[in-house]
Amino acid sequence: MSDNSKTRVVVGMSGGVDSSVTALLLKEQGYDVIGIFMKNWDDTDENGVCTATEDYKDVVAVADQIGIPYYSVNFEKEYWDRVFEYFLAEYRAGRTPNPDVMCNKEIKFKAFLDYAMTLGADYVATGHYARVVRDEDGTVHMLRGVDNGKDQTYFLSQLSQEQLQKTMFPLGHLEKPEVRKLAEEAGLSTAKKKDSTGICFIGEKNFKNFLSNYLPAQPGRMMTVDGRDMGEHAGLMYYTIGQRGGLGIGGQHGGDNAPWFVVGKDLSKNILYVGQGFYHDSLMSTSLEASQVHFTREMPEEFTLECTAKFRYRQPDSKVTVHVKGDKAEVIFTEPQRAITPGQAVVFYDGEECLGGGLIDNAYRDGQVCQYI
């Protein structure tokens, strides 16, 4: 058996059950483990309680229980500069960003990884549901987590080969109930703590209220694609393509009682377009353009790839053909896709392996750009 005691692994600990069990498993496997709590956002919850303080208390309790040293590190400036400013800029541009993808790329596997190296880390580890496997030549492949409902490779798709070389995902081969069971058997104080939801820096707060603190809302007209006035929208940034709720129009416009959906945005005229029916023509597209395209291992500068893709988290894979040129790609769908949303990630898979991905710029329907923004 190999001696892991000479291998230092720095674990990103959030105060949740997943990262607690990550640290526990590595400690049990004999690694030299250090726990790090990242404070990325200065926050209080609806009751005025600082959530970071409460989470750090949980980290301290777990670290003491399993017998590992722990530190807290403040990445608020890095988070604001590299993630939150991007998040706001995307909303200003009428897009719907995915801050979790950027947070992993810029904070958890850049700022945190760099900090861990100053502590003499050989690897960093997180509680993500993903797997890494190493070829004989040392190349690392990132595979989906075994728990299909929890697989987080979608959010890790912008990681580089260099980052993956230094990363361990101890939970990748486990299902979520097994993780809870391990925490309970070890008597960890976080065993029954509920999973966090929502964007990391917003937590459980009302999204609309949160966003309005940073971006002034500009109400405008809500219209059908054929020009019927449907009332007023609260501000384009509050709506995403394919959204059903929150339109306030129900079936009051006579005739068809089919539900209404957001089908497009015109940023220059501040118009929100709506249409009836889940598969409204305006929601369907046949291809997309992506930028910031990146692969988890070395690929040619220009190539074509037949693979599957996800256009949002927890969506089933769809067959696609990808034409890559530098950091841009055209992605052609085998079957038309619904509600392709600029700003979201498109992520490519070859079977179990996550190959990488990019950010969606435009969706196309038979060669014509969809009026999404």
Curated annotation (Swiss-Prot):
Pfam families: tRNA_Me_trans, tRNA_Me_trans_C, tRNA_Me_trans_M. Its main location: cytoplasm. The keyword Protein transport does not apply. One of its GO terms (cellular component) is cytoplasm. The record marks 128, 344 as: Interaction with tRNA. ATP binds at residues 12-19, 38, 127. Its EC number is 2.8.1.13. One of its GO terms (biological process) is tRNA wobble position uridine thiolation. It comes from the Bacteria. The active site is at 103 (nucleophile), 200 (cysteine persulfide intermediate). Residues 150-152, 312-313 are annotated as: Interaction with tRNA. It is an enzyme of class 2 (transferase). Disulfide bonds join 103-200. Belongs to the MnmA/TRMU family. Catalyzes the 2-thiolation of uridine at the wobble position (U34) of tRNA, leading to the formation of s(2)U34. This is tRNA-specific 2-thiouridylase MnmA.
